[in-house]
Amino acid sequence: MDAAKVLAVAVPCNRINPLANFFRRGLDATWGAGLPVVAIPTTSGTGAEVTPFATVWDRSTRKKHSLAGHFMYPTHALLDVELTVSLSREDTLYPGLDAISHALESLWNKHSTPVSTAMSLEALSIAVEALPQALERPFDRFARERMQQASLLSGLAISQTRTAIAHSISYPLTSYFGVPHGLACSFTLPELLRLNLPMLVAKSPHQRTLFAAL
C-alpha cells in the first residue's frame, strides 16, 4: 500500500525516473494531489489504509524514506477479512505487534489528543484479546476482523500523533539485520511500557486492567 501511495503522488509530478533519486536528494519540491488510491490491506497491522504516511526503503543505502501529508491519504479503504484468514503465523504476529506498537506510541506521544487516546485505548483493548485468538485459531474470522479494527484504529491514532521511539529504534534493526518491522518495533515495548506506565495510569486510571494485560 505504501508503494501505491507514493506512486500515486509521484506519477503526476513526473518523479519516477528513478524515484529513489528524489528521496536521496531530499524532498525539497512541492507534492500535490495525486491519483486516487483504493487501499485494501491484506495484513492487520500497518494501518496504512487510513494514514497520511508512506515509507520507502532504499536497500542500496539501507535508509528509510518517508512521505507525509494530507495528499497521502488513500481515497478509499476497503477491509475484507477473507484476505487475512490464510496468513501465516508470522504474518499474523508481526503486523499485530506493529498495531500494538502504534497504539502504545500514540498513547505516550507528546502530540496525543483526547481523540487519539480514545482510539489507541480501543485498539489496545481489541488487540490484546484478538491477536492471541487469531494466532491460536487462524480461521477465526471474528478474531481476524477485530484485528483489522485494531489496526485501523491505531492507524488513525498515529495519523494524529505519529509514532515514537520504538519505531525509531526499530529501523536499523530492519535495514541492517532484516528483522521484520513489527517484530523490531516490539523489542523495546516492554521497557518503554514500564517507563511510561505511571503516566498512562495517571492519564487513563480506568484502564489499569488493560495496561496490566500488556
PLM region descriptions:
Residues M1-E82:
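Glycine/threonine-rich beta-strand-loop-alpha-helix active-site module
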Residues A4, L97, L124, A166, ...:
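A general structural signal for well-ordered alpha-helical segments in protein cores
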Residues N21, R146, S186-T188:
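Beta-strand segments within the central parallel beta-sheet cores of soluble alpha/beta enzyme folds
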Residues G45, L152-C185:
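Glycine-rich phosphate/pyrophosphate-binding beta-alpha loops
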Residues Y176-L214:
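Gly/Pro-rich interdomain helix-loop hinge
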